[in-house]
């Protein structure tokens, strides 16, 4: 998946600093994609510290006023028109006036508190996709680890001839020995920029409500507990990881799904699978539909396109019904739970955010 615009600029700047590998050089079925053979094509391995630095530099160059350590509290409304927001920081409450507000909270917090209709997760099934605590390991003998994969390729778990997961042979062994008290049946190990570093996407915390602080607190603590258990299993069983070190867990729990705003257009999974590109598309994307946990805690689904090579996300998905001067960006745009499984990841949400910013600027400029 290659998306241009600001995403491309961010990636290029990270590469210049030695902190990323260009997605055109990264293919599926490789260590960078955990050997997954469906979806996960053209991903971008990067260093988190490099990304932080690049984003700060770009914001400074664009003369953006940034307020870290500041939390949205409630919208300022005049009828159905949003005129700004009340925020809170160590300095107390503050009112920020705005001609256009962009809700990039990931949970449609602004839209929801302004009165916009929202769907929570998958309403039909009464579930949301599970949360994950990413973590990073280093000091791995990658040649030894990759040799183990090569030796076990005939043991890959395949569905319709396609590999969806790896290292399940070691997970099964660990479970037999009482070292894996966990419902996942495989490991997601993704090679990083440096040869000895890997990112682990395996933990799974079900039923997390990303709009509730108690639920988020539980998820973060449970995620770290799971990361510790997974790391100990990796160190004990996976060849090349005998001397590995757990470098860091993510700064916050990884949320896949919460609210989906009701917008002027609702992106459906068939729009994606049929390669639909509406006239008002604000981006095109080729990412597969990636749904975790819909059929129980062990399930993973990858749905790829039936027609074409890419699909479009219409501008109407960013425009919530009933509320004026408000746009929504990120995973909480107007989309079904299944469709959101494709556009919730980093490159698409960056493109959606850029589109929302351009639309807001144009609306102000053109009155």
Locations of regions flagged by a protein language model:
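Flavin (FAD/FMN)-binding glycine-rich loop and adjacent Rossmann-like elements that form
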Residues: 1-9, 15, 25, 46, ...
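A conserved beta-strand/loop capping segment in the N-terminal third of enzymes
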Residues: 11-40
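Trp/Phe/Arg-rich N-terminal binding region typifying the photolyase-homology
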Residues: 36, 66, 75-77
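Short beta-strand to alpha-helix junction loop
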Residues: 37-54
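A conserved beta-strand/loop element that lines the FAD pocket in flavoprotein oxidoreductases
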Residues: 59-73
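A short, glycine/Asx- and small/polar-enriched loop/turn
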Residues: 77-83
């Amino acid at each position: 998946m290659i998306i241009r615009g600001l995403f491309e600029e961010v990636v290029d700047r990270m590469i210049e600093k030695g902190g990323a590998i260009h997605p055109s050089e990264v293919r599926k079925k490789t260590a960078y994609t955990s050997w997954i053979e469906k979806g996960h094509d053209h991903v971008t391995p990067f260093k988190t510290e490099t990304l932080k630095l690049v984003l700060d530099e770009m914001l400074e160059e664009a003369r953006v006023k940034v307020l870290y350590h500041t939390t949205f509290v409630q919208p300022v409304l005049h009828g159905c028109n949003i005129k700004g927001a009340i925020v809170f920081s160590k300095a107390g409450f503050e009112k920020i006036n705005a001609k256009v507000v962009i809700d990039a909270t990931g949970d449609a917090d602004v839209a929801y508190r302004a009165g916009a209709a929202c769907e929570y997760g998958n309403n039909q099934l009464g579930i949301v996709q599970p949360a994950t605590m990413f973590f990073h390991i280093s000091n791995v003998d990658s040649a030894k680890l990759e040799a183990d994969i090569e030796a076990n390729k005939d043991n890959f778990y395949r569905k319709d001839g396609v590999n969806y997961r790896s290292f399940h042979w070691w997970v099964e062994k660990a479970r037999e020995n009482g070292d894996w008290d966990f419902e996942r049946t495989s490991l997601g190990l993704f090679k990083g920029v440096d040869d000895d570093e890997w990112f682990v996407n395996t933990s799974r915390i079900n039923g997390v409500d990303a709009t509730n602080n108690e639920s988020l607190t539980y998820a973060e603590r449970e995620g770290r507990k799971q990361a510790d258990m997974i790391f100990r299993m990796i160190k004990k069983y996976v060849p090349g990881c005998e001397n590995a070190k757990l470098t860091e867990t993510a700064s916050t729990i990884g949320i896949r799904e919460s609210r989906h705003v009701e917008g002027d257009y609702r992106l459906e999974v068939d729009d994606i699978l049929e390669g639909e590109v509406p006239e008002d598309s604000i981006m095109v994307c080729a990412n597969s539909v990636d749904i975790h946990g819909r059929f129980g805690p062990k399930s993973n689904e990858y749905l790829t396109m039936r027609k074409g090579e890419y699909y479009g996300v219409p501008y109407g998905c960013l425009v919530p019904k009933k509320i004026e001067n408000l746009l929504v960006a990120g995973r909480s745009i107007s989309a079904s739970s299944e469709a959101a499984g494709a556009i919730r990841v980093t490159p698409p949400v960056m493109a959606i955010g850029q589109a929302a910013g351009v639309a807001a600027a144009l609306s102000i400029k053109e009155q």
